UniProtKB/Swiss-Prot annotation:
The enzyme's E.C. designation: 3.2.1.78
Signal peptide: 1-35
Name of the molecule in the record: Mannan endo-1,4-beta-mannosidase
Reactions it catalyzes: Random hydrolysis of (1->4)-beta-D-mannosidic linkages in mannans, galactomannans and glucomannans
Subunit structure: Monomer.
Temperature dependence comment: Optimum temperature is 58 degrees Celsius.
Class of the enzyme per the UniProt entry, highest EC level: hydrolase
Stretches assigned to the CBM10 domain: 339-377
Keyword flag Signal: yes
Any Pfam family hit: CBM_10
GO MF annotation, one: cellulose binding
Similarity comment: family membership: Belongs to the glycosyl hydrolase 5 (cellulase A) family.
Keywords from the named record: Glycosidase, Hydrolase, Signal
């Protein structure tokens, strides 16, 4: 989410969007190495915990960098049932720098409230205009604060390198810039799961992330990068939502909806389709945002004035509506939650196997995970 941004998409831009979204993804090769077990990591195109249990994010964004005195919001969000909080930080390029000690304290609050912390640098929003900083500069920030209790925090923290890098210009540079930033963090010894946002203000209408995700994933020596799409006005139909998310899931690439709302100045996102499709596919989603929005998008607040007892219509929808957080969130097993198979549901009503064919030794399409039968996606049993 950008601060009071203009999200006008030109006719030419939409033409590129159509072309980009037609590109087929070449998924990661079956023989590639993936991140070694330990901490949140990617396995068979899914986000899992260190013990191999599937973890599907169901959470909320919190604008910490603009409201550093509202850290109680993490507890309030957790109390509503979220299993993840995406926390807005600043590298100092556009707003006051979030210090290493603040990062450490935020991780501590997430752990105390039994939620996974997705930490993101917001200064990169729309790089190329508005004074936004580069992904390379965001990488420098992460390297600089990695002493902030990073050791042994891989079970609890996902590092979202930079929010919505690249706006609607020069976005072709996203692929190389993202690969370079991943390399910088890995070279500095960060072993956490990484999250990378799409260009085009996070909405990837050009199909840049969709077309290049496989090569970006392969560039990570840990094979531990999760892709994040932000769904606002570009995703105003169920078909667009399903098409985008299925492109990643079908090609074994990890995807989450890192931001979305129920309305926006650039169009009317189909939040019902976003939540239903995410639930069906076992894909994580993080709604924007708890409170404190301005610049004409105050309707994206889930609660009024940071008061957890004063829900807005958007807050009620995402928390308690169909496929909402309260009904679908599962606490991470590292906190004692039950976990469970969350790879989505097959047409026959059985869950899909999170570990794919590895759970099906006899090759009949049926596997066994979490003490129950599961279906291997695309097998003869997938009907």
């Amino acid at each position: 989410m950008r601060n009071a941004r203009s999200t006008l998409i030109t006719t030419a831009g939409m033409a590129f969007a159509v072309l980009g979204l037609l590109f087929a993804l070449a998924g990661p090769s079956a023989g590639r190495a993936e991140a070694a077990a330990g901490g949140i990591h990617v396995s068979n195109g899914r986000v899992v915990e260190g013990n191999g249990s599937a973890f599907v994010m169901r959470g909320v964004n919190h604008a910490y960098t603009w409201y550093p005195d509202r850290t109680g919001s993490i507890a309030d969000i957790a109390a509503k049932g979220a299993n993840t909080v995406r926390v807005v930080l600043s590298s100092g390029g556009r707003w006051t720098k979030t210090s290493a000690s603040e990062v450490s304290a935020l991780i501590g609050q997430c752990k105390a409230n039994k939620v996974i912390c997705v930490l993101e640098v917001h200064d990169t929003t729309g790089y190329g205009k508005d004074g936004a900083t580069s992904l390379d500069q965001a990488g420098d920030y992460w390297v600089g604060v990695k002493s902030a209790a990073w050791r042994a925090q891989e079970d609890y923290v996902v590092v979202n390198i930079g929010n919505e890098p690249f706006g609607n210009t020069n976005y072709a540079a996203w692929t190389d810039a993202t690969k370079s930033a991943i390399g910088k963090l890995r070279g500095a010894g960060l072993g956490h799961a990484l999250m990378v946002d799409a260009p085009n203000w996070g909405q990837d209408w050009s199909g840049t992330m969709r077309s290049n995700a496989a090569s970006v994933f392969a560039s990570d020596p840990d094979r531990n990068t999760v892709f994040s799409i932000h769904m606002y006005g570009v995703y105003d139909t169920a078909a667009e939502v399903r098409d985008y998310l299925n492109a990643f899931v079908g090609n074994g690439l990890p995807i989450v909806v890192g931001e979305f709302g129920d309305q926006h100045s650039d169009g009317n996102p189909d939040e019902d389709a976003i939540m239903a499709t995410a639930q069906s596919l076992g894909v994580g989603y993080l709604g924007w945002s708890w409170s404190g929005n301005g610049g004409g998008v105050e309707y994206l607040d889930m609660v009024n004035g940071f008061d957890p007892n004063s829900l807005t219509s958007w807050g009620n929808r995402i928390l308690y509506g169909s496929n909402g957080i309260a009904a679908t969130s599962r606490t991470a097993t590292v906190y004692g939650g039950g976990g469970g198979s969350t790879g989505g549901t097959a047409p026959n009503g059985y869950p899909y196997c999170v570990n794919g064919g590895a759970s099906d030794p006899d090759g009949d399409g049926w596997g066994w995970e979490n003490s129950r039968s599961c279906v291997v996606r695309g097998s003869a049993a997938d009907h």
